Amino acid sequence: MIRHTAVDVPPGTCYGQTDVPLKDSFEQEAEAVVERLQPGRFDAVYSSPLSRCVRLARFCGYDEARLDARLMELNFGRWEMQRWENLSGPQLLAWYEQWIDTPTEGGESFMDQYRRVTAFLDELRRLPYRQVAVFTHGGVIACARIYTGEITFEQVFTTMLPYGSVKKIVV
């Protein structure tokens, strides 16, 4: 699983399924991803449909990556593109206390995201592929790591992989 490169969003901004731009350092970061993927011979290549993932997949030579909405980041609903420090209200407090099961305002819960990611992984397991590349997001990779038992739900925020990471997941 490959996490997209750094996004051009002000620090402290809540974003998930918003199609945000990448930083000017994209090519340099993407070259490092290409090096980590070599000699990448994949039976199939998938990508989140968000441009930050599609652009990286194409840069890495996978113009025909299969787009799958289940690989999108968490939907933060009305919180998208708001500064975390400006968010308030009972829904935010409930989310902070029970972020696994509480949906964001107008969005989804982490458990909602986990279910769609595990549905993708369950489907992938039934296919005859041995090696698959998946261009996606930090939250999706965290869900996959929970699915395989590498981390727990409680470790999601303390073990988030950096932008441009390549993480081998065995399902």
Spans of features found by a protein language model:
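Phosphate-handling substructures
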Residues: C60-R115
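Active-site signature of alpha/beta-hydrolase-fold catalytic machinery across serine-
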Residues: F59, C143-Y147
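Short beta-strand scaffold positions
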Residues: S47-S48, R115, F135-T136
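Active-site-proximal alpha-helix that buttresses catalytic centers in soluble enzyme cores
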Residues: I2-D63
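Domain-level recognition of soluble alpha/beta enzyme cores
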Residues: I151-V171
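Short, active-site-adjacent cap segments at secondary-structure transitions
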Residues: D8, R52-V54, E73, V140-C143
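Histidine-centered catalytic micro-motifs
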Residues: M1-T5, F135-V140
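Generic beta-sheet signal
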Residues: P128-T136
